[in-house]
Curated annotation (Swiss-Prot):
Positions of Mg(2+) 2 binding: 282, 284
Catalysis: reaction(s): 5-phospho-beta-D-ribosylamine + glycine + ATP = N(1)-(5-phospho-beta-D-ribosyl)glycinamide + ADP + phosphate + H(+)
Pathway: Purine metabolism; IMP biosynthesis via de novo pathway; N(1)-(5-phospho-D-ribosyl)glycinamide from 5-phospho-alpha-D-ribose 1-diphosphate: step 2/2
Cofactor(s) named in the record: Mg(2+); Mn(2+)
Name of the protein described by the UniProt record: Phosphoribosylamine--glycine ligase
GO molecular function, one term: metal ion binding
Keywords from the UniProt entry: ATP-binding, Ligase, Magnesium, Manganese, Metal-binding, Nucleotide-binding, Purine biosynthesis
Cofactor binding annotation: Binds 2 magnesium or manganese ions per subunit.
InterPro entries listed in its UniProt record: ATP-grasp (IPR011761), ATP_grasp_subdomain_1 (IPR013815), PreATP-grasp_dom_sf (IPR016185), PRibGlycinamid_synth_ATP-grasp (IPR020561), PRibGlycinamide_synth (IPR000115), PRibGlycinamide_synth_C-dom (IPR020560), PRibGlycinamide_synth_C_sf (IPR037123), PRibGlycinamide_synth_CS (IPR020559)
Record keyword Manganese present: yes
One Pfam family this sequence matches: GARS_N
Record flagged with keyword Ligase: yes
Residues annotated for Mn(2+) 1 binding in this entry: 270, 282
Length: 423
């Protein structure tokens, strides 16, 4: 098979690492990819939202499958155009992609199809959002409506902080994504990430993990795209998994199909496990980043047949995936200043050495100079991942590897996995 993988982050590097290991794959091309992905695939300098160029590239390499990594490609309508050209694609249409690209759409969708979620108000102005605060008790949750790279959510402890978040959104901090906001009820419980595949009709659960959104240890500081993950996560008891499947996953797939946009790809369900059962926090229409990294380390099965089955409508013929009876941890190394303005261009050394058993480093935001020097080129720069017999072993391996990487402008959290280890 010839496969085109779209994207350039740590999630896409993890997908490339797993896809390249498949005996079914003859040629793997990434667009645009990153320096780390060059070990697994050919790189082409085509951006993830340049739909005409991506379709042309898929035709050029005679792609048997296009795998869409980032949400920006979904929002740009890449899957729609590929389907129109008869090119098999793993990833939903832009219509189905509204489950991520608009918080207001998702809230209305949840109401329409009975998915449990937090009480909310959609606000078109700062004045309306400030008035909506009267409906809720602190902490307040303020969400930019559109795509904001995981940084558009503020959990405000008091009204002053909430009003500042509202002013930031309507003041242009998130561009068009902040043209309206959702003010919602704060949910008490433990958050988790669950993934499900769908081929337009049949669906299948595809792993779960737990993320760390806040930038600093102890869940302090602003939200990020994710500072680390681990899998399996003890919060996902068999009872909770079944509740998520029946109350969130299956109604979501049925609902989006009823709306005229059958879902093909992976759905990322971010949920809060409350005393009243799971409640939807948000949907994402792609693998989580960095959740994907730990799932790929734990996935024993060949990933490619599942991607193909989603694209071709044969998921119902596939067996459940097989997972390693091991834990996996991902620790994100970010550039200082993230999630604000990250330090750019810092030199990175030490990735060419043996970093230990079952350790894999995925590139997330890197570039390589003409002389081969590796440098930071983003907020989240590296994903240091490790497997182990248990969570503590995997975590220790990841942090031991980080100690051997030289990146003066980088930082990471030191407490990834604290919820599970503290049980």
């Amino acid at each position: 098979m010839n496969i085109l993988l779209v994207g350039s982050g740590g999630r896409e590097h993890a997908l490339a690492w797993k896809i390249a290991a498949s005996p079914l794959v003859k040629r793997l091309v990434a667009a645009p990819g990153n320096p780390g992905m060059a070990e697994q695939c050919e790189l082409r300098a085509v951006g993830p939202t340049d739909v005409p160029a991506l379709v042309a590239l898929a035709k050029e390499i005679a792609a048997d499958l296009v795998v869409i990594g980032p949400e920006s490609s979904v929002d740009a309508g890449l899957a729609d155009q590929l389907q129109a050209e008869g090119i098999p694609c793993f990833g939903p249409t832009a219509g189905a992609g509204q489950l991520e690209s608009s918080k207001a759409f998702t809230k209305a969708f949840a109401d329409r199809y009975g998915l449990p979620t937090a009480a909310y108000r959609v606000c078109e102005s700062a004045e309306a959002a400030r008035a909506a605060l009267e409906l809720f008790e602190p902490p307040y949750v303020i969400k930019a409506d559109g795509l904001a790279a995981g940084k558009g959510v503020t959990v405000a402890q008091d009204r002053g902080e909430a009003e500042a978040a509202i002013d930031d959104a309507f003041g242009g901090r998130f561009g068009a994504a902040g043209a309206r906001v959702v003010v919602e009820e704060f949910l008490e419980g433990e958050i988790g990430s669950l993934f499900a595949l769908c081929d337009g009709e049949a669906s299948m659960l595809f792993g779960w993990a737990q993320d760390h959104k806040r930038v600093f240890d102890g869940e302090q500081g602003p939200n990020t795209g994710g500072m680390g993950t681990y899998s399996p996560a003890p919060v996902f008891t068999p009872e909770l998994v079944e509740q998520v499947r029946t109350r969130l996953v299956e109604p979501a797939f049925a609902g989006i199909a009823a709306d005229g946009s059958p879902y093909r790809g992976v759905l990322f369900v971010e949920l809060m496990a409350t005393k009243h059962g799971p409640k939807l926090v948000e949907f994402n229409v792609r693998f989580g980043d960095p959740e994907c990294q730990v799932l790929m380390l734990r996935l024993e099965s060949d990933l490619v047949p599942y991607l193909v089955a989603c694209a071709n409508g044969t998921l119902g013929d596939m067996p459940p995936p097989v997972w390693r009876d091991e834990a996996a941890v991902c620790v994100v190394i970010a550039a200082k200043g993230y999630p604000g303005t990250p330090a750019a261009g810092g030199e990175i050394r030490g990735l060419d050495q043996d970093l230990g058993d079952d350790v894999v480093v995925f590139h997330a935001g890197t570039k390589r100079d003409a002389d081969g020097t590796l440098r930071a080129a983003g907020g989240r720069v590296l994903n240091v991942c490790a497997r182990g017999a248990d969570l503590r072993t995997a975590r220790d391996r990841a942090y031991a590897a980080i100690e051997r990487i030289e990146f003066a402008d980088g930082f990471c959290r030191s407490d990834i996995g604290w919820r599970a280890l503290g049980r």
